[in-house]
């Protein structure tokens, strides 16, 4: 295991925003025994452990992350347990899985085709789009607890709500997810739905610059976060090289050379403007990781 641990690995290019400093220690495991040994070493060394997947919903501090960063990008594999029931490792792409299951005629993940994250991140954040969310098809997850115990946890025990789960408060590593999909559908029809979702996404969301998707959660009710940010005149606002997208006000773009501090400052400005105009304090959809990067509110 020690020969796979790397000190001082830059995390910027491993995230959608392409900002952030180095990991004190970095590991990209592919085997269970390597992961178990590394987590045991971190416990004995009293080092904090941070787990990342596709890096699509993260803002990492400019000074980096202390302790051990476990990158599950290569933790891949899908097992068909029965018709419509699959076990998927945490590093698998949720968008790729949406295509694969649609081609089998299994419905339930079509909404996820444009979501650039991993299965593990989708579980932790209860990712969603187009009125659907990951919890709709999730049966259970396999986790590695802070004591090194492997445990199967039913979806009903995870506190899954809009863009939230109890996993965000636990020092557990999500290893895999068990999904129950609906077989018996026409693959061509499911692919047609996927194409419709893709067309909508390309029409309404910006591309061309690094971004992590929606910055703030929708607060509930009729007013969406993007709508309020738009009406508050925030499109095009910038801090350093971080800019609110002109196409969608709930996106922040890294136009080249932005820092995590730039993005955090811009997010704070956006939040404060919406509070002043609408009396609603938007909550981040982005997770903040690393030293010196704190969200006030």
From Swiss-Prot:
Where in or outside the cell? Cytoplasm
Q: Which SUPFAM superfamilies match?
A: FAD-binding/transporter-associated domain-like (SSF56176), Uridine diphospho-N-Acetylenolpyruvylglucosamine reductase, MurB, C-terminal domain (SSF56194)
Q: Which residues form the FAD-binding PCMH-type domain?
A: 18-184
Q: Which cysteines are joined by disulfide bonds?
A: none
Q: Which GO terms describe its biological process?
A: cell division; cell wall organization; peptidoglycan biosynthetic process; regulation of cell shape
The GO terms this record gives for MF are: FAD binding; flavin adenine dinucleotide binding; UDP-N-acetylmuramate dehydrogenase activity
- EC number of this enzyme: 1.3.1.98
Can you quote a single GO CC term? cytosol
Q: What does this protein do?
A: Cell wall formation.
- Protein name (Swiss-Prot/TrEMBL): UDP-N-acetylenolpyruvoylglucosamine reductase
Gene name of the encoded protein: murB
């Amino acid at each position: 295991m020690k020969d796979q641990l790397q000190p001082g690995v830059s995390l910027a290019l491993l995230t959608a925003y392409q900002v952030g400093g180095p990991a004190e220690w970095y590991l990209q495991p592919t085997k269970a025994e390597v992961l178990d040994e590394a987590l045991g070493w971190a416990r004995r060394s009293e080092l904090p452990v941070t787990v990342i997947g596709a890096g699509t919903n993260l803002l990492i501090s400019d000074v980096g992350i202390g302790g051990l960063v476990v990158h599950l990008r290569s933790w891949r594999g899908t097992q068909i347990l029965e018709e419509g029931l699959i076990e998927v490792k945490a590093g698998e792409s949720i968008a790729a899985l949406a295509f694969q299951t649609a081609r089998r005629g299994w419905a339930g993940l079509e909404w996820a085709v444009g979501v650039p994250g991993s299965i593990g991140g989708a579980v932790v954040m209860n990712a969603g789009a187009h009125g659907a969310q990951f919890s709709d098809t999730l049966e259970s997850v396999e986790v590695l607890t802070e004591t090194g115990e492997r445990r199967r946890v039913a979806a009903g025990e995870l506190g899954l709500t809009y863009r939230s789960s109890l996993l965000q408060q636990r020092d557990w590593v999500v290893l895999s997810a068990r999904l129950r999909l609906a077989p018996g559908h026409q693959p061509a029809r499911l692919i047609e739905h996927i194409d419709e979702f893709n067309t909508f996404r390309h029409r309404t969301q910006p591309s061309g610059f690094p971004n992590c998707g929606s910055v703030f959660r929708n607060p509930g009710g009729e007013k969406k976060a993007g709508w309020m940010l738009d009406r508050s005149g925030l499109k095009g606002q910038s801090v350093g090289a971080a800019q609110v997208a002109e196409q969608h006000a709930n996106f922040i773009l890294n136009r080249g050379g932005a820092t995590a501090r730039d993005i955090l400052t811009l997010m704070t400005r956006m939040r404060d403007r919406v509070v002043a105009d609408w009396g609603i304090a938007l909550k981040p959809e982005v997770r903040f990781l690393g030293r010196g990067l704190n969200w006030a509110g």
